[in-house]
Amino acid sequence: MKRALSSWGLMAALVFGVNAAGAQTTVFSTDFNGPLPAAIDPGSALLTGVQYFAGLGPTGQAFGGNFLRSATGNVVTLTLSGLPDHSAINLGFLFAAIDSLDGTGTYPAGDFFHITLDGRTIFRESFANATPDQIQSYVAPAGVTLARRVDLGFGGPGSYYTDSAYNLAADPAFQNIAHTGSTATFTFQIEGQGIQSLDDESWAMDNLSVSVNAVPEPQTYALLLAGGAALGWAAQRRARA
């Protein structure tokens, strides 16, 4: 009996293992170190050297070379088509908060990083760099903050011109977002009454990627379950022998 249970346990592990191994399929990625992909409409955003952001981030996925830098108020759009069957979508990128972003303030009246998927808001939080007493609504989960209110180039140095960096790929808010369509449109914008010119405040992204949680083919489960039945039958025969 124990052998039979062990066999079924093995098959269960195989089922979940296959599901996990095939769970995420990358459908888009760019490090912005070549021509801008056709899937991205940058608006007024430009490929720009990362300056002192270089090296911040996980091994193999750190800031480096160029990133896509945008003025506040500008909309960057990523449009994907021909997506495979899936049950959820995942978004990952490094986010650079550059210079005097004002958080949730009264004057200026706030800088909110707003991300939508197919017109639906999936993220809207304020970011503050200018002074320590400003309110930043975004509370980064463990492992997301790479730098906070330090001079990483651009408008700095100066008390109002510090920078911050975040690995938003590590934030669970961007994982397992319900989605099943064959197309997906993401928009990225810092908006709010406090938006100002590029030489005062801006933002950038690097190592942008999108993956989907693929729906396993029905025959995969059928084959695994058939194999499990065979293993269980063989184990029972051995137990009786």
Feature map (PLM): residue ranges:
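Short beta-strands within extracellular/lumenal beta-sheet-rich domains
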Residues: 70-86, 111, 168-174
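Terminal, low-complexity interaction segments
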Residues: 30-36, 138-213
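A short, hydrophobic C-terminal helix/tail in secreted or cell-surface proteins
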Residues: 217-236
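Extracellular carbohydrate-recognition regions
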Residues: 24-48, 122-127
